[in-house]
Every structure is written in C-alpha cells, then in structure tokens.
C-alpha cells in the first residue's frame, strides 16, 4: 500500500501546475528543476515530492483522467 501525500504538497503542486501548465513535462528531473526555479522551497525532500506529484498530474492529464 502506498503513502498518502501531505496536503501542502498536493496544494503547492496543483497551484504550480495550474499556473504554469506549459512548463512541466513527464520528466521528473525537468520538473524538479522547474519547482526549484518557481518556488522558494529549501528542502530537497519537499521539492522532490512536489515535482513527483506534478509529474503524476501531467501523466494523468495526458491520459485524460483529469481536466
């Protein structure tokens, strides 16, 4: 069974994804760099979790599971 992501990670990821939809791709490494540029997150762990969730959102949007 997986872990549930914390609310502030989901909220931050959704805000970034809604605000800058063209800056994110299915590539985690690219998304990680974009999160670093667009936010002031200092923790590497939090940055990676946000980037991972954004990667998941991009994949779900491409598959038509979210609008």
Curated annotation (Swiss-Prot):
What are its GO biological-process terms? Answer: translation
* InterPro entries listed in its UniProt record: Ribosomal_eS17, Ribosomal_eS17_CS, Ribosomal_eS17_sf
Q: Specify the superkingdom.
A: Archaea
A GO MF annotation of the entry reads: structural constituent of ribosome
Query: Which keywords describe this protein according to UniProt?
Result: Ribonucleoprotein, Ribosomal protein
Cellular component terms per the entry's GO annotation: cytosol; ribonucleoprotein complex; ribosome
Cysteines paired by S-S bonds: none
- Database matches in PROSITE patterns: RIBOSOMAL_S17E
Check the record and name the HAMAP family matching this protein. Answer: Ribosomal_eS17
Would you identify the family this protein belongs to, as annotated?
Belongs to the eukaryotic ribosomal protein eS17 family.
Sorted alphabetically, which PANTHER family does this protein's record hold?
40S RIBOSOMAL PROTEIN S17 (PTHR10732:SF0)
Q: Could you tell me what this protein is called?
A: Small ribosomal subunit protein eS17
Q: List the source organism.
A: Thermococcus gammatolerans (strain DSM 15229 / JCM 11827 / EJ3)
Q: What is the lineage of its organism?
A: Archaea, Methanobacteriati, Methanobacteriota, Thermococci, Thermococcales
């Amino acid at each position: 069974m997986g872990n549930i992501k914390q609310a502030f990670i989901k909220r931050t990821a959704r805000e970034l994804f809604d605000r800058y939809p063209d800056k994110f791709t299915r590539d985690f490494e690219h998304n990680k760099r974009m999160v670093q540029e667009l936010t002031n997150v200092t923790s590497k762990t939090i940055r990676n979790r946000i980037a991972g969730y954004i990667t998941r959102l991009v994949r779900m949007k491409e598959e038509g599971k979210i609008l």
